[in-house]
Every structure is written in structure tokens, then in C-alpha cells.
Regions:
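Metal-dependent amide/peptide-bond hydrolase catalytic core
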Residues: 1-115
Length: 115
């Protein structure tokens, strides 16, 4: 790093800070969540991501301590109108997704109580 910067007539300083750990879903819990999502939303509305994502998520602390499954709940308007990104002051959630999320979590809790 410093040699590359020196070659351009500059100085460089590298500082690496500890961040969140990897977020890894538990297969057994993920299977339950996937099944519940397919029952509630239909198979054509459930996407199981297999490829790693380079983002970070503080839920990784929970997942490291207990079997878990992190999932996303879509909140785009059903009419297909554009949606701003999350964590944006212009983001306007379609509040109909709240009931869907509550129903999804209720199904998950009831299913996981029987494991």
C-alpha cells in the first residue's frame, strides 16, 4: 500500500478496524423459514440466496450465539412503482408488508416451538 502511494508521490496509511462477523444461517432453521414463506407467500415469491454477500449485518452476533435464519421481507408496492433504497430519507415502505411480516414471524415461532 505504501509503495503504491509512494510511486504516485503520496503517502498512505492503512487502518483495519474489526467489524461484524460473518452471518451464517442454520440449515434446519432456514428450511423451516423457507417452508413457512412458501406456504404464506407462494413458492414464486420466495428466493433462497445461496451466494455470499459482502455486506455486514449486526444480526450476525445473534446468529453466532443461537441457531437462526436471517431473511428479507419485500416491501415494494404491489403496483410496481419504484422504491427508494432502505436507510434513505426518501424510503416509503408499503405498510401492507407489516402484516405479512407479523404473520411470517408467527408461523416461524409456532413451527420452531415443535423442533
Amino acid at each position: 500500500c505504501s509503495d503504491v502511494a509512494a510511486g504516485m508521490g503520496a503517502r498512505a496509511e492503512l487502518s483495519i478496524q474489526e467489524s461484524y462477523g460473518p452471518l451464517t444461517n442454520t440449515d434446519q432453521i432456514t428450511d423451516v423459514v423457507r417452508k413457512n414463506a412458501e406456504e404464506l407467500l407462494g413458492c414464486n415469491h420466495v428466493v433462497l440466496e445461496k451466494e455470499p454477500d459482502l455486506g455486514t449485518e449486526d444480526f450476525s452476533y445473534f446468529a453466532a450465539a443461537r441457531p437462526s435464519c436471517f431473511f428479507h421481507l419485500g416491501c415494494a408496492p404491489s403496483d410496481g412503482s419504484p422504491v427508494e433504497c432502505l436507510h434513505n430519507c426518501r424510503f416509503n415502505v408499503d405498510e401492507a408488508c407489516i402484516a405479512t411480516g407479523v404473520n411470517m414471524q408467527l408461523k416461524n415461532v409456532l413451527s420452531l416451538l415443535t423442533l
